[in-house]
A protein has these predicted regions:
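Aromatic "clamp/platform" in nucleotide-sugar-dependent glycosyltransferases that forms part
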Residues: 234
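Conserved small/polar residues in nucleotide/adenosyl-binding loops
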Residues: 307-312
Length: 312
């Protein structure tokens, strides 16, 4: 399966297309068609060549900066060793843009620090609010699919098999909390990630499941049907899965890192500094010692709807 399609980047591209459709903006996916502006999301040689060709033809180039040196680290085998080279490469791509768009003020600050001179705009990847509106049977459908009882305590997370996604902490939480079911959605080819991640994914625990990639509608059911969604990531440019979870009115705990400063801890969601705080908050949410913030979370992303972020 194409890694881009099942990643946040693939989701971001779909959001861009949907936002243009909602606003009646024509677009094409064929570079041979007639167009005024080229919007590039990827970092391969073909993308870089397309930007160069478009500029030569007098077209305007928007380069979407989804990647940073910081979120490349702690991902694939050798990513830390070559992160400096990766930074040079992405900068050479982003310099092709007349403007650069990136999802958050946090990622904008990182990219500005790379010495790029083009205007940089922070625009959220957005969320399709209607698609993630909870439905009455979502919880039941999720629990039936995964063989879960109604009173099972269920914690989920979503992401590629990367260390920076907090996967090692997630597995340790499952070890520490045997009376809770932990399910991780998303996947990455195991040959591409370090040994410690492969070992973690192969961990055999009765309360730990690596469910792999599931379709967006099934994932929405999981957001609705779990007791707590956690995002233990250590580095992000935004995190579309977080927007999805908030829109689906999940009980959300994120790691307390700068990219999530736009969320108010204790109001929109809960924020944990480390594994121990995640574990404490999971228990306190389930036991009712911490109030549910489901409705507040949904409100927090209402201004990030696709129609809203794509307004002129």
């Amino acid at each position: 399966m194409n890694l881009i399609k099942i990643s946040g980047l693939g989701r971001a591209i779909m959001h861009q297309q949907r936002a243009m459709e909602l606003n009646g903006i024509e677009y094409t996916l064929d570079p041979k068609d007639s167009y005024d502006v080229v919007h590039i999301n990827t970092l391969g040689l073909k993308s870089k060549h397309l930007a160069k060709k478009a500029k030569k033809a007098g077209k305007r180039v928007v380069y979407h900066a989804h990647s940073t040196q910081e979120d490349f680290r702690n991902s694939f085998i050798g990513s830390n060793l070559i992160s400096g080279l990766f930074k040079k490469w992405i900068c050479s791509c982003y310099r092709r843009g007349d403007v650069i768009v990136t999802p958050t003020e946090y990622s904008k600050s990182l990219i500005r620090g790379y010495g790029l001179t083009a205007p940089i705009y922070a625009v959220s990847n957005g969320i399709d609010l209607a698609r993630y509106e909870p439905k009455e049977n979502d919880r039941e459908a999720f629990r039936k699919k995964f063989g879960l009882k109604d009173d099972d305590k269920v914690v989920i997370s979503v992401g590629l098999y990367f260390e920076r996604k907090g996967l090692l902490d997630f597995v340790q939480m499952a070890k520490d909390m045997p009376d809770y079911k932990f399910i991780w959605f998303g996947k990455t080819p195991l040959y591409s990630v370090p040994h410690k991640i492969r070992k973690a994914v192969k961990t055999k625990l009765p309360n730990l499941t690596f469910a792999g990639y599931v379709q967006p509608d099934e994932l929405k059911q999981a957001y609705v049907g779990c007791d707590v969604y956690i995002f233990p990531t250590l580095e992000e440019t935004e995190g579309i899965v977080l927007l999805e979870a908030l829109a689906a009115k999940a009980n959300v705990i994120v790691r307390d890192i700068p990219v999530f400063d736009w969320l108010n801890g204790g109001t929109d969601c809960y924020k944990a500094k480390d594994k121990d705080e995640f574990e404490r908050m999971i228990k306190e949410i389930y036991e009712g010692k911490l109030p549910s913030l489901r409705e507040n979370g949904r409100k927090a992303v209402e201004n990030l709807s696709l129609i809203h972020i794509s307004e002129p």
